[in-house]
UniProtKB/Swiss-Prot annotation:
CDD domains in UniProt: BRCT_DNA_ligase_like, LIGANc
The protein's name in its UniProt record: DNA ligase
EC number(s) given by UniProt: 6.5.1.2
GO cellular component terms, A-Z: cytosol
Annotated positions binding NAD(+): 61-65, 110-111, 144, 167, 204, 317, 341
Taxonomic placement: Bacteria, Pseudomonadati, Pseudomonadota, Alphaproteobacteria, Rhodobacterales
Amino acid sequence: MAGDDEDRAVPAAEGAPPPSALPPVSGLDVKAAEAEHARLSEEVAQANLAYYQEDAPFISDAEYDASKRRLEEIEARFPDLAHSGSPTAQVGAAPDTRFAKVPHRLPMLSLENGFSQGDVEAFVQRVRSFLNLASGAPLEVTAEPKIDGLSLSLRYEGGRLVQAATRGDGAVGENVTANARTIADIPGQLSGDGYPEVLEIRGECYMSHEDFEKLNQSETGRVFANPRNAAAGSLRQLDPSVTAARPLRFFAYAWGEVSASFAGTQMEAVRRMQAFGFQTNPLTRICASVSEMLSAWAEIEQMRATLGYDIDGVVYKVNDLAYQARLGMRSTTPRWALAHKFPAERAWTRLEAIDIQVGRTGALSPVARLHPVTVGGVVVSNATLHNEDYIAGRGADGSEIRGGKDIRIGDWVEVYRAGDVIPKVADVDLAKRPSEAEPYAFPTTCPECGSPAIREEGDSVRRCTGGLICPAQAVEKLRHFVSRAAFDIEGLGAKLVEELFRDGWIAEPADIFTLQDRYGPGQLTQLKNREGWGEKSAASLFQAIEKRREIPLARLLFALGIRHVGEVAAQDLARHYGSWEALEIALDTARPAALAHRVAEDAALAEREAARAEGRRARPSEARAAALAQVDLSPEATAAWTGLIAADGIGPVLAMSLSDAFANERERAAIDRLVSFLTVLPPEARATDSAIAGKTLVFTGTLEKMTRAEAKARAEALGAHVAGSVSAKTDLLIAGPGAGSKAKKAAELGIKVIDEDEWLAIAQG
């Protein structure tokens, strides 16, 4: 996707603190964990959408990795927060609706990330433990550069290319066959012989640095931000002739569905792919120990600047394919591979100004305006400063970061770019601080509308209280409303929305659906006379708007731009309630209970603060109960609130945000006006062909043909839940030799019991 001429600092989650500035997960209570889980879930889900679908990432790889790691840590400590819709259980993002969908016969998974020697050692130890290998037993691992491009799957039948698809969400990708045929590195017909009748080759589409520079020099308008964006935007073109004119390359490194095995090791497979006519990375090598793996990583990192294409780490893979098969997959990553990421690139420059951007939820986000400096081959002039605590040298828990050094205009600051996206300010050189530099005074009023900007207890950011009267919030909500994962109206992008808002043609989403009445037949000249418009383009816009009068419930919920309601949460809500009407009724009914919940949480917070001041043990549960006892709630309100917070992936923080939005008179009126123009479609029913999907399994006794870990992983991959004990909720018990009390209890409860051979028939199904 083409980017602006200058990099624009758009904070990942408005005003969100960097993970390094957050308190340890072990120090979080349930309320704090819920709030942070909701924020991180939205941040990671939006980052997935921007990176995989829109080719316009707005956070760095390092920031993304750190946020996802922290999300995983929170879910590990608070298991009730984990759910099937969490970004930790997702791969990529939903496929772009402009392209035909292609189901992947074998999922295109992501890779587990590592960042240190300890991570690499732990990976090897996990592999050995899973395979039950002795410490001295040989274990070969391949090491290859991790190309920073766009993942692509190529399907060959009889040696002929019949289909090319992007990763998409890992299960369903986008059909880009016509575009892939124009790439010189992708053979239309496989070379040699001995290839399987059906062969899916997977690899990375990328652009070299030299070709990237030439492409940007040839562009007369907007230029690409980096080679990865250029490659992704070039491949995902509706017109194949555009792709053909772009200098795309392709490295093959993996495979999906095959009708017959074509290699016994990863390295042999790489050589066979090369013989079939594919480019494979010449730096791929075999390592026999952790020390050799780390040496390969260090050598490849040293070569990074001279390779001529972008890489962001080294990928390790267990070489023996029989071992790979035994190790199998987690829900989103293979157990037999690890991506060992490179550290961020850094440079020093002067901070010339601090500007405040106002996001769609009202968050005031500080942006550093820098003296231009080259970092990682890209000129950087903007960087995010996260929030006022980060500027002041404090973490979210009040602890010092950067040794307590604050950031001031005129300072020399260290800037880093990890993943070639939005830069961050990492450090300050106090020795070079100008004597006249004053501490930065974070604004307490909105710079866009003048409304008070307040910071609520437990929040890391200040937010404008102006709501829709704030032009910055209004236009950002409109930009979000027309984004690809929301209404995605063809011809109505963010730029046009800003123009129409500026000129007074639209002020809220509902106005989009009255454009034709106001500027259509009889008044068409007003629209067609706009710069760059004509009668045909105006008519096309109206037609595109008409098509979006029917909208899936999940898209509508995401499009509303309610705080914490990201794409995944919107899908969870849609599945839980099934219709717009049911959701409205539930929220209206639950409102008194939502307010009571807020009173109870405030009481719990006051109890904690009082206990801290008095040096005693806090009793927040008792404080909550006492506060709730003062509120007279109907059973219907209690049931509606309980149902909302119990919905998969929701929880109290998101539920409160949703309730507040629907209870706000001005916001609810805008929502009602919008919905009056729409037909809201219910979610499609989920389908699965697994015989054990949704069922609860228990394993007992000794399994002789696979390890317990392998069996559990396979069951979960087929959609089952594996429990540790037998109960009335158990659907199936798999009993090996030595089964004891669990088998007896299953018999008493009438639960079906099968042996390992029957289990293998299901697992290999």
